[in-house]
Amino acid sequence: MPKHGKKYLEALKLVDVTRRYSPKEAVELVKKVAHADFDESIDLHIKLNIDPRHADQNVRGTVTLPHGTGRTPRVLVFAVGEAARIAEEAGADYVGSDDLIRQIEGGWLEFDAAIAMADQMGKVGPLGRILGRRGLMPNPRTGTVVRNPEDLPAVIREIKGGRVEFRNDRTGNIHLQIGRKSFTDQQLLENLYVAVDAIARARPQAVKGQFFQSMTIAPTMGPGIPLDVATTVEEARQFVT
């Protein structure tokens, strides 16, 4: 069991682990337990009632957070020719093809999202063993494989404006950044609602019974705040609709 420092243990005293907090209570409390001397990330952790061993129960999608995550993601685009020019003008941080592929194969991963033109996927495909487990592999399901170069600016803008990808891990959990300690309570709350609703809408048909088993929000260095699942899901639905 990991050993925690004095500040963490002091922060933990503020959390009643036997309670399940409402979203409003949780976002207020999570900022109080964020004790580090930097602008900590605030992350949403969800345990899903799925069996990740079955492909038809895996959860994956994207969500555009209304207030972003607190940082501008670095976007890489696999493209050549006119598509590369459009991507550069649209603000992509890295644009290329064979050169970028070689760098990634060599261990370079200094980017947060990757987009590929469809005609590049034959070359990009083998990178799946590197990018897939990090959630960076371009995928048609998440809109990051683009056929028309003229669609690139919209995709790049959306990612830089707060679109994030979510997917379950091998244990059926989803982890998603919903902001930073410096966000207002309302900004965190709205990002939380939009994220939860998007994940709820991504529920696979093969999943039976209750979809969400538990939800927690936590700062980078502090303890988690357990959420009341039913209340959070209902408030998220009402906010989005």
Swiss-Prot record:
CDD domains: Ribosomal_L1. One of its GO terms (cellular component) is large ribosomal subunit. The keyword RNA-binding applies. GO terms for biological process: regulation of translation; translation. The keyword Repressor applies. It holds the Pfam family Ribosomal_L1. Gene3D superfamilies: 3.30.190.20, 3.40.50.790. Keywords: Repressor, Ribonucleoprotein, Ribosomal protein, RNA-binding, rRNA-binding, Translation regulation, tRNA-binding. GO terms for molecular function: rRNA binding; structural constituent of ribosome; tRNA binding. SUPFAM superfamilies: Ribosomal protein L1 (SSF56808). Signal peptide: none annotated. NCBIfam families: rplA_bact (TIGR01169). Belongs to the universal ribosomal protein uL1 family. Part of the 50S ribosomal subunit. Binds directly to 23S rRNA. The L1 stalk is quite mobile in the ribosome, and is involved in E site tRNA release. Protein L1 is also a translational repressor protein, it controls the translation of the L11 operon by binding to its mRNA. This is Large ribosomal subunit protein uL1. It comes from Thermomicrobium roseum (strain ATCC 27502 / DSM 5159 / P-2). The gene is rplA.
